Amino acid sequence: MTDGDSPLGRQAQKSKNTREKILNSAISLIKEGGYSAASASRIAERAGITWGAAQHHFGSKEDILEAVMTISHERFIARVSAPYLREGTLADRVDAFVDCMWEHYQEDVYLAGLEILLASREVSSRRMSTFDQSAREHIKTLHEIFHDSDLTDEHLQEVLIFLHSVMTGLTIEKVLEKELRGEQRHLRRCKLMLLTAISNV
């Protein structure tokens, strides 16, 4: 009998599936109606469970929302860890990195995380710790992708914050207007900005 066939293995898989249903429920509700639409009762209802069962898996609505943001970060790190981003010329890597970021910013989980951040401006100590850890991972990743740049951690963080701010603004514009006019031109500008900054021109 394998672990997946054992009672413990089946229970673990069932628990994992339920957690995913809860998180997907929260993400879809936020996508459809914004942060306020993701009430505790509606998250549980859409997931097909009671709120008590949801609490068993996460503890509170706030824990669910924190988990959504964690997933968004994990998916971003998984994307930018792809080997192809570390291949080719500097210009090739800049183009690929910006495209990779943009693809992530179009995902429902990123948009849900953005809504959560905007709606809950008070930064908890736990979230601040998560932000710090995320920043360190992002800088490490940038050093790996742009290994031929001599920018310091501080300068790389400045570049990433600027790029993130521009692309988040473009993402919000796309959400509000249903489309982003001149999308490819905007992305080319982002690539030129990043290439200039990474080249330390």
What is the predicted function of each stretch?
Residues 34-35, 55:
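Short amphipathic helical patch at the helix-1/turn junction of helix-turn-helix
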Residues 103-104, 119, 144, 163-181, ...:
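Amphipathic C-terminal alpha-helical segment
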Residues 67, 80-110, 153, 159-163, ...:
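Hydrophobic alpha-helical connector segments
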Residues 1-33, 40-46, 63-66:
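Basic, helix-initiating cap at the start of DNA-binding domains
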Residues 70-76:
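Short, basic, alpha-helical segments at the C-terminal edge of helix-turn-helix-like DNA-binding modules
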Residues 58, 103, 115-123:
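Short helix-capping/turn signature of helix-turn-helix
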Residues 77-82, 106-108, 124-150, 157-161, ...:
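Amphipathic alpha-helical packing segments from all-alpha helical-bundle domains
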